[in-house]
Each structure stands twice: as structure tokens, then as C-alpha cells.
Design a protein with these regions (language model features):
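Short His/Asp/Glu-rich catalytic/ion-coordination signatures at enzyme active sites or charged loops
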Residues: 100-110, 129-154, 158, 162-181
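Conserved small/polar residues in nucleotide/adenosyl-binding loops
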Residues: 192-199
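Active-site cores that bind ATP or allylic diphosphates and position pyrophosphate for catalysis
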Residues: 1-124, 183, 187-191
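Hydrophobic alpha-helical segments, chiefly the membrane-spanning helices
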Residues: 204-205
Length: 205
């Protein structure tokens, strides 16, 4: 309406649908602290392993020889989100990729334990750098607050500049717009001059 100051943000969503929302390890709609079905970034390696091995899979996959379902199978949902070709090279070289692993599970002959162990290796590799970094930061809490303060100050500075541009576009930056101040000053002079003539005219009359 006023000026092209604010840019409409674009929606950014991952191509991998599994990344949009990970279900809880019990197969519920989402991870929930109250349900206790979360894997936390602060979890130890043992805690992650325990949670992965307790993950919800296919309730009908009772025997290794039974064909399994990957739809609604939490373990495969997590593998969709996190597994990479190099993970298979390191931890499961019998399979070239996730599609081959899924196909084997669906036709039967692949147990849940083997798939869960693979997922655990994948998650441990992804989480270890985060876990180590977090441990380093935890050694110096004042530095964390210092980093947060610097970030807040920088964000506040950018926000102030944006707000100034918005006010300028809306002509409400009364204390910064010199053109507006000049225009108001000229208007005030003209009004005062007019009132002065009215007063003199009234005196003459």
C-alpha cells in the first residue's frame, strides 16, 4: 500500500516428507515430552540406543521370515529422514541403498533388530558432533549468554532499521523525516501568516 519495504516470505519445505514431522518413537503423531517418546539432542549415546531399540515397528512382523510393512513403521520413517548412501557403505554394506533394505523387509527375511541397529548407527553419527559441541558449550555458561546477547543486539539493530523503513514509507517517522519536518514548518509559517492578516483585517474593520 505504501511502498515495497516488507518482502513477503517464501515457504521453505524439505523435499523429503519424512523431515516435515518425525513421529515419536512409539509411533504417535509427534514427539511429546509429556508422552516420553522423544529423542533429545542432549541424550547420551546409550539413551539414544535404548530408545531406538524400543521403537515402534510393524506389529504384524512377528517372525523374521514374515513380510513387513514400511508404511507407519517408525524405524523406516527415521531412516527416510536421516540415512545416506555412505551410511550403508559403513554400517550395512550388504545393501546399496534404503530402497534395497525396504524391499528385503517387505518380502520377509529381515528382522527388526538388524534394521534398528542400523538406524542407531545412523543417528549416533548424526548426533555425535552435536553432542560434543553441546558438551563444550556447557563448560562455559557465561559465554553462552554472551553469544545470545550479541545475537539479540544484532537482531535488534536489524529490526530497528526495518522499522525505520516502514515508518518512512508510512510517513510516520516524525523525528527522522527532514522533508516532513520542512513541509510542516512551511505549513506552520503559512498558517501563522494567514492568521496575522486576519487579525489586522479585523482591526481595520
Amino acid at each position: 500500500v505504501y511502498a515495497p519495504v516488507l518482502v513477503e516470505p517464501e515457504v521453505l519445505l524439505p523435499d523429503n516428507k519424512a523431515c516435515m514431522r518425525l513421529p515419536g518413537i512409539d509411533g504417535k503423531a509427534k514427539m511429546s515430552k509429556s508422552l516420553g517418546n522423544c529423542i533429545y539432542l542432549s541424550d547420551t549415546a546409550d539413551e539414544v540406543r535404548t530408545k531406538v531399540m524400543s521403537m515402534y515397528t510393524d506389529p504384524e512382523h512377528l517372525q523374521v521370515s514374515d513380510p513387513g510393512h514400511i508404511e507407519g513403521n517408525t524405524v523406516f520413517t527415521y531412516l527416510d529422514a536421516f540415512s545416506k548412501p555412505e551410511h550403508f557403505e559403513r554400517y550395512l554394506p550388504d545393501y546399496a541403498n534404503l530402497d534395497e533394505l525396504k524391499a528385503h523387509y517387505q518380502r520377509g527375511g529381515l528382522g527388526d533388530v538388524k534394521v534398528k541397529k542400523f538406524l542407531n548407527n545412523v543417528l549416533q553419527e548424526e548426533l555425535e558432533p552435536i553432542r560434543s559441541r553441546r558438551a563444550e558449550f556447557a563448560k562455559d555458561i557465561p559465554e553462552i549468554y554472551n553469544i545470545l546477547k550479541k545475537g539479540s543486539d544484532a537482531a535488534r539493530e536489524v529490526a530497528a532499521q526495518t522499522l525505520s523503513e516502514v515508518k518512512s514509507a508510512m510517513k510516520i517517522n516524525y523525528f527522522e523525516d527532514m522533508d516532513l519536518i520542512k513541509a510542516q514548518s512551511e505549513k506552520s509559517v503559512s498558517y501563522t501568516h494567514l492568521r496575522a492578516h486576519e487579525t489586522l483585517a479585523n482591526l481595520v474593520c
